[in-house]
Curated annotation (Swiss-Prot):
Listed name of the protein: Giant hemoglobin linker AV-1 chain
InterPro entries found in the cross-reference section: Eryth_link_C, Eryth_link_C_sf, LDL_receptor-like_sf, LDLR_class-A_CS, LDrepeatLR_classA_rpt
Keyword DNA-binding part of the UniProt annotation: no
Positions annotated as glycosylated: N108
A GO molecular function held by the record: oxygen carrier activity
């Protein structure tokens, strides 16, 4: 049978379909490039924030006296006790910044920690769980947030799994951004959780000898 030539309307329709396909393909390519750019920009911003924080932390260690912190990017140092007390002590008001004064260890929050090293605990736990059982919500302009905590320890002995549950008092210091758990046992080992000022969902937990202040174990905690 003879091939019938395309009508004008059919030819126009085919051309429109081809153009639509090309436009759709270009749109998808552009979106992919745009998404990749957004990801790169986001990573760069995040990396920049972390780099700035690391630099500031390094400067804090060498710039300000013990129990003092820099007022953000300012060279001014301020006592830990002046942070988040409702009074602007830093010239740039960094000490009362709403992000700086967040208390990440809220009531009913749970934090699971895994050992980086352990040279001193009795049980040598492979997992430690800190649960915040109570945190007063009416304390706004207080440098120290009092807490009640439960510490669950999971360990192994002779191939058998063991667990222990301890209860005690703790405090979150807004100035130093530290969670301090008083020694829950007679060995007088306290837990000091140090937040980095960037991520509120994790912290380094140090086991510290109460009398000397020496760190003898470290756990990495993550919010659940």
């Amino acid at each position: 049978a003879a091939v019938q030539p395309l009508s004008v309307s059919d030819a126009m329709g085919a051309r429109v379909d081809a153009q639509a396909w090309r436009v759709d393909r270009l749109t998808k390519q552009f979106q992919a490039i745009s998404d990749a750019a957004d990801t790169s920009i986001g990573a760069a911003k995040s990396g920049g924030d972390i780099a700035r924080h690391m630099l500031n932390s390094h400067l804090d260690d060498h710039w300000c006296p013990s129990k003092y912190h820099r007022c953000g990017n300012s060279p001014q140092c301020m006592s830990n006790m002046a942070f988040c007390d409702g009074v602007n002590d830093c010239k740039n008001h960094f000490d009362e910044d709403e992000n700086r004064c967040v208390v990440p260890v809220t009531a009913n929050s749970t934090w699971i920690g895994y050992p980086a090293y352990d040279h001193c605990t009795q049980r040598r736990p492979y997992e430690m769980v800190i649960s915040i059982t109570s945190a007063p919500s009416d304390i706004v302009y207080k440098v120290h947030q009092p807490l009640k905590v439960q510490v669950d320890l999971f360990s192994k002995k002779g191939g058998l799994k063991q667990s222990a549950s301890l209860h005690g008092d703790a405090v979150y210091c807004k100035g130093s951004q530290r969670l301090i758990v008083a020694p829950p046992e007679d060995d007088r080992l306290e837990i000091i959780g140090q937040f980095d000022g960037v991520s509120n969902d994790r912290f380094k937990g140090y086991i510290v000898r109460e009398m000397s202040g020496d760190k003898c174990a470290e756990f990495r905690f993550f919010k659940q």
